[in-house]
Amino acid sequence: MWLMCTQKTGLSAKGLQRELGLGSYKTAWLMLQKLRDAMVRVGREKLTGTVEVDETYIGGQESRVGGRELVGKSLVAIAVELEGKKVGRIRLRHVPDASGQSLVGFIEDSVATGAEVHTDDWNGYNRVGQAGYRHRVTPVLGDPKRALKHFPHVHLVASLLKRWLGATHQGRVTGKHLQRYLDEYAFRFNRRRSEHVGKLFHRLLEQLVLRQAKTYLEITRAK
C-alpha cells in the first residue's frame, strides 16, 4: 500500500510484482484492485459551485457515426468542480452510453443539487435542469476546437487521465475493470496538493478499515 500511495504516477501490477518479488502476477493485480476498491469513500461529499461536465473516449478514436456512438471503446463521464479559474475536485465514471439516463444519473450522483452544471448541447444533458441544477449550455456544434475553448478544465482532466493510463498501465486497462482505475486517478488527483507524501497512505488506510475487502471472484465477476 505504501508503494502504491507514494509513487507519484501510481503502480502497475507488473511493477508491484517486481518490487515485492512476487511469483504471481495475479497476486499483485488482486492486491492493487482491492486497494482501488477502497479509494471511494462511502458518503463522500458531492461537487459544488460551478461544475463542468463532459465525456471522453478511452482506448481509441471517437466514431463519427451517430454522434457519440460507442464502437468497442470505453466512454468516461467527467465532472470538474471549478475553483475560480482553477480545477478543483473531480469525479469520473465509466458509463455504458451517452444517454440522458447515464449522464444525468452520473451528475446526480456526483454533483450537489443547486450547483451550476455547465455542459455542451448534447441531448443527453437535456434533463439536467429538471434534476434540480442550474444548467448552463454552451453549443459546440461537434467542433473539437470549440469544445476545448469552452470546456478547458474538463478537457485538461481528460488529457491527464489518458496520459496516466498510458504511462503507468501502458493503456492495458479493460472496460470491465476501468472504473477502479478511474477511482484511483480521482483519489490521487483530488489530493494532489497535499504537502505530505503520506497523506494518501493514511487516508486509504482509514478507508480500508471501514470496508470489507472483496474476494478474487467478486472482483473478477464485477461488470
Please report, for each region that a protein language model flagged, where it lies by residue.
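Residue-level recognition of single "structural anchor" positions
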Residues: 1-223
